[in-house]
Amino acid sequence: MNKDFNEFKKFIYNKKVAIIGLGISNMPLVEFLSNLGARVTGFDKKNENELENNINELKAKGVNFELGENYLDKLSNFDVVFRTPSMRTDHPILIKAKSEGAYITSEMEEFIKYCPAKLFCITGSDGKTTTTTLIYNILKTEGYTVWVGGNIGNPLFTKIEEIKKDDKVVLELSSFQLMSIKEPIEVALVTNVSPNHLDIHKDMEEYIKAKKNIFKYQRENDLLVINEDNKITKSMEEECRGRLLKFSMKEKLKEGSFYYNEDLYINEKKVCNVSEVKLKGMHNVENLLAAFSCVSEDSSIDSMREVAKNFNGVEHRLEFVKEIQEVKYFNDSIASSPTRTLAALQSFDRPVILIAGGYDKKISFEVLAKEGISHIKHLILLGDTKYKIEEAFKKVMRDSSEDLPISICNSIEEAINIAKENGESGDVVTLSPACASFDMFKNFEERGNKFKSIIRNL
């Protein structure tokens, strides 16, 4: 049983509150906390003209703002500080605020602490969003009122008084959000772990440690779901504090979900055949298995089967865009890691024309090159990592008999033109960057929408 939200309302009233970062989750938080009687100041590196939201109404309500290049200079003597998820917990300004007596927290920490409904929380390096959405859809099909949030959906803390005890809440959580989570989570899922976000985390060890926070504070009756086939997640079994279920594409399991002889099972009961699954790619079969284990105590097999047969995917995840002169174009902009792009390549029955590259998260492309080269007909690279990816593939070509045409370009428009010029009847072109988008775009959605807009106008 989580804490009563009335406790938070009493706690926050008349407190001097700093909210760092005025993005999607924190902007509604500013108004919400102000309405609860907090004395709020919003901090953001952007100036007022660059903010996506108009702040004049909030100013009229007494909210203060510190904006622009030196926005953190006046963050001093606050009672409570809400950090933005991308801000490290050991940032000097947070250490200073804590030494002054401030309570450091985040929107997600407070939501998990006070959420009245059963929580299903999902983390991992790949497959988080699709699996989160699958869990949401299965629970909804079962007849529950379901809320979805975290990295997808809407900020939920401001809706907390609308959420009922019998509802279900599904959260996609990043390693950044998990770094400071110290609350028990009823159902925790780790889809898989591979190198990622090493531009933010000090090393792989810190990244894994953050992921483990999803189950570190679980109680005896809480449930942890892990991937039996992933070396890192399998090792987490030793640290499980509650009950454990697994999912596997390789092994038959007495408890949990598995894939065997082209059928998907949960607790040794068949859900459906792989031919009935609407989602493209075996990595999505794995995502379904993860979802089945998570909802096995709250859902019927009928609801699992219905979603498996009818769910056709999430925007920007191997999303079919258009067929032009017998060449099919797919948008996989969500693929911000090499493992995700490799999974996308393996989903097609022929080598594809791949558009890749983007923001450098300081991770290796060696495995993508070694295992992906045979799945690529033509590699088109752009963004900060274009030469880094090119070198990884050239090394594979030097060490083997493989050969692959590689084109380097400076914009997504140029990349699409090269793809169009080289595409032949029956070919597949996919944007699956293997990198984050921040070098050229605001986020992966903007990158994907730009790609789709250009393709639809060809």
From Swiss-Prot:
Q: Chief localization class?
A: cytoplasm
Top-level taxon:
Bacteria
Residues holding ATP: G124, S125, D126, G127, K128, T129, T130
Q: Which reaction does it catalyse?
A: UDP-N-acetyl-alpha-D-muramoyl-L-alanine + D-glutamate + ATP = UDP-N-acetyl-alpha-D-muramoyl-L-alanyl-D-glutamate + ADP + phosphate + H(+)
InterPro entries, per the entry = Mur-like_cat_sf, Mur_ligase_C, Mur_ligase_C_dom_sf, Mur_ligase_cen, MurD
Q: What is its EC number?
A: 6.3.2.9
Check the record and name the Gene3D superfamilies matching this protein: Mur ligase, C-terminal domain (3.90.190.20), Mur-like, catalytic domain (3.40.1190.10), NAD(P)-binding Rossmann-like Domain (3.40.50.720)
Under which main EC class is this enzyme filed? ligase
Q: Where in the cell is it found?
A: Cytoplasm
Pathway assigned in UniProt:
Cell wall biogenesis; peptidoglycan biosynthesis
The terms under GO molecular function for this entry are:
ATP binding; UDP-N-acetylmuramoylalanine-D-glutamate ligase activity
**Biological process GO terms, please?**
cell division; cell wall organization; peptidoglycan biosynthetic process; regulation of cell shape
Q: Which GO terms describe its cellular component?
A: cytoplasm
Its keywords, alphabetically, are:
ATP-binding, Cell cycle, Cell division, Cell shape, Cell wall biogenesis/degradation, Cytoplasm, Ligase, Nucleotide-binding, Peptidoglycan synthesis
Q: Which family does it belong to?
A: Belongs to the MurCDEF family.
What PANTHER family does the database record attribute to this sequence? UDP-N-ACETYLMURAMOYLALANINE--D-GLUTAMATE LIGASE (PTHR43692:SF1)
Functional summary from the UniProt entry: Cell wall formation. Catalyzes the addition of glutamate to the nucleotide precursor UDP-N-acetylmuramoyl-L-alanine (UMA).
Protein name as annotated: UDP-N-acetylmuramoylalanine--D-glutamate ligase
In its UniProt entry, the species of origin is given as Clostridium tetani (strain Massachusetts / E88)
What taxonomic ancestry is recorded?
A: Bacteria, Bacillati, Bacillota, Clostridia, Eubacteriales
- State the encoding gene: murD
